[in-house]
């Protein structure tokens, strides 16, 4: 799973995802992309599942770029623990995704192959996405 090698602070505030993506909203590397339409949190497991779905769909052809990285720790207290006694331990890593953010990009495949691969990946993600093509 993807996670930062080291972080300055072990635990972070929850925070909220508001507004639209300004950076990372355009295709920079490939000819085809998968863009988020809704906001949400993307876990490292979901990101990896989407990447595997794309790579299995296109087999050995094409190049894939992953444009998001899970850099926010999510904490969780153990089951059946009384309230209080501080914040829980880091459980998983998530990426905060805003509407308009490009999640994956692909190059070296046909439009139909890219569309099918991104549809398979979209089923693994917790929010709505759309297919982008470079003009």
UniProtKB/Swiss-Prot annotation:
Residue stretches in coiled coil: none
UniProt keywords, alphabetically: Ribonucleoprotein, Ribosomal protein, RNA-binding, rRNA-binding, tRNA-binding
A Pfam match: Ribosomal_L16
GO CC annotation: cytosolic large ribosomal subunit
The keyword Ribonucleoprotein appears for this protein: yes
Annotated InterPro entries: Ribosomal_uL16, Ribosomal_uL16_bact-type, Ribosomal_uL16_CS, Ribosomal_uL16_dom, Ribosomal_uL16_sf
GO BP term (any one): translation
Transmembrane annotation, as ranges: none
GO molecular function, one term: tRNA binding
Family: Belongs to the universal ribosomal protein uL16 family.
Subunit structure: Part of the 50S ribosomal subunit.
Role this protein plays: Binds 23S rRNA and is also seen to make contacts with the A and possibly P site tRNAs.
UniProt protein name: Large ribosomal subunit protein uL16
Annotated source species: Bdellovibrio bacteriovorus (strain ATCC 15356 / DSM 50701 / NCIMB 9529 / HD100)
